[in-house]
Amino acid sequence: MVSTKLIANAESAAEFLMVMGNEKRLLIMSYLTDGEMSVGAIAEKVMLSQSALSQHLAKLRALDLVETRRDRQMIYYSCNSDAVRELLVVLDGIFGGGKEDLSQMAQRLRRAGT
């Protein structure tokens, strides 16, 4: 059964899922839920240039999913969203337990044109 809250907030939910639906942003947020990280450390973990990373971080900041802290020239990011934490728990429950081979799911999605 679909809740009336979800119906009322469908546009916001879709925007949130669109931002979180990007592989790199999903990885960024996964790392940030473990604690604060510098821009350089995030870039290294997700294998992005700092310029590419800054574009992803801008989208996450736009939805207030991350918060920043500056220490001299270093900028540190952390997760600022309980919704992100909950989403990652759900995704880990679906994909983290080996319920389905992710490579097979990805192949099916590509065949379906998604």
Protein language model features and the residues they cover:
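N-terminal helix-turn-helix DNA-binding core of bacterial DNA-binding proteins
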Residues: 8-51, 74-84
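Short, positively charged, low-complexity/disordered linker segments
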Residues: 68-69, 73, 112-114
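Beta-hairpin "wing" of winged helix-turn-helix
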Residues: 61-71, 78
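A short, surface-exposed loop/turn module that caps and links secondary-structure elements
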Residues: 48-53, 106-109
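Residues within the DNA-recognition helix of helix-turn-helix
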Residues: 56
